[in-house]
């Protein structure tokens, strides 16, 4: 166990909140400072907020700069996990170079139409995402995944997914991009590691997960309370869970409002309350 984990092991928390970023805590304004402040607000009420994103280690480090209480974070859809004071992040699965080599092999054997971040210029990436030049550069610094812009049919995407599965890779769909990573990796992997770290026999925290897309499903499934945010088309990703809350829209204000409602409503939360399905929508 590293120094940072030893330092935090004694800290008991009632709530562990795992949250996706784009389309959940962040909206099109991409206000990292406000997102950090929203997570800090919950921390002041006894919650540890753990961001879990397709973003890179460098991008997540930038978010932590705006937090008074930096937390662990899960990056690249679960291909990595970083503790606040750890000298190096943990990496899981194949690295990006190996993934790209395998993608080149797939491209040579099939006629799939897509472009990875290695084929998209920084300028085009800025235009697609609205990121600054420095943020776009950070988004390309991948260690365990490769995002791509799918330019083929949904049927071709299914065939692509099958071809990847055969060689131990997977494609996950986020908001704007798909991402290819090792089949063993997902946000739930990082969530499980963080949750185990904070679990104590006398004080087991309640797990809350927030997300809006298919790449959040494993993380949502592990939670005691799942919070769904609408995708860009206004629809909620299909998902079954004993306790589901539906947020009206994304962005730090709505995220914080929803979380405040949940923390108040579920103050007396216990295991027996999971015996029924609950649906709550917050406007």
Enumerate the language-model features and the residues they cover:
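Mg2+-dependent phosphoryl-transfer enzymes with acidic/Ser/Thr/Gly-rich catalytic loops
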Residues: 7-12, 32, 178-283
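Asp-based phosphoryl-transfer active-site loop
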Residues: 13-29, 220
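The start of beta-strands in P-loop NTPase/AAA+ ATPase cores
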Residues: 14-17, 71, 207
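Short, acidic loop-to-helix structural element flanking the phosphoryl-transfer center
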Residues: 27-45, 158, 185-197
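Active-site phosphate-binding/coordination module
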Residues: 28-119
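Short, structured coil segments at secondary-structure junctions
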Residues: 67-69, 76-77, 167, 222-224, ...
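Short hydrophobic/aromatic-enriched beta-strand-loop microsegments
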Residues: 70-76, 134-135, 226-231
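Conserved acidic, metal-coordinating active-site core of Asp-based
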Residues: 106-208, 214-215
